Design a protein with these regions (language model features):
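Aromatic-rich, lipid-facing transmembrane alpha helices and their immediate juxtamembrane interface loops
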Residues: 1-194
Length: 194
């Protein structure tokens, strides 16, 4: 339940990060195909990263801690390992998800072709570096304090937030997926061009 709520917080952060990127690169803020300001894919990504890798200074591979000790050398090795694995996860993840999604739905959700050092339309070195750096900062400086704060909340409050927010966010995501995959329409609830 605590990890679920943390994932929903990350879904909101992902929504605003994507909108910030779109504002800077295209001068637009939009709904990101959602009614609510949450992108469920970031919940899934945060769970995968945490369950597989832990946090940057205490990196692991699932249950196995990669670098023993809490000295600076172990932490540095841990951070380098974490950065490289996250970079590869994002780099190949965007290619795989973008390719599969476009093949299945016939819809293109993003295109990095206009960005220097793009590898395919789905990924580029600058975006992957930026996203990896963002993950490093969030997982090292935000994740543990967030979990501590959530764990201090009354259990029933966490459970209610999980059910209410989780139901709304997953339903919103499913509406988007059905709209794109079956009706071939990306739901555009609102957009502001600057």
């Amino acid at each position: 339940t605590h990890l679920w709520l943390a994932g929903l917080v990350y879904a909101n952060i992902g929504y605003w990060v994507e909108n910030l990127f779109r504002l800077v690169s295209k001068g637009v803020l939009d709904s990101r195909n959602q009614i609510f300001p949450f992108l469920f894919c970031y919940t899934i990504a945060m769970w995968a990263l945490y369950l597989a890798l832990g946090t940057p200074k205490k990196a692991r591979w699932f249950a196995r801690r990669m670098f023993e000790g809490d000295d600076k050398k172990a932490q540095l090795h841990s951070q380098i390992y974490y950065f490289v694995v996250v970079f590869l996860f994002i780099f190949f993840g965007e290619i795989i998800v973008g390719t599969l999604f476009e093949r299945i739905s016939g819809q293109q959700l993003w295109n990095y072709s206009g960005i220097p050092l793009h590898i395919t339309q789905y990924t580029s070195i600058p975006t992957t570096l930026a996203l990896t750096t963002g993950v490093m900062v969030l997982m090292e400086n935000f994740f543990t304090p967030l979990m501590t704060r959530i764990q201090k909340m009354p259990y029933k409050t966490v459970l209610r937030l999980d059910y209410i927010l989780g139901t709304l966010i997953v339903a919103d995501w499913l509406v988007m997926m059905i709209s794109i995959n079956f009706f071939k329409v990306q739901p555009a609830y609102w957009s502001i061009q600057f």
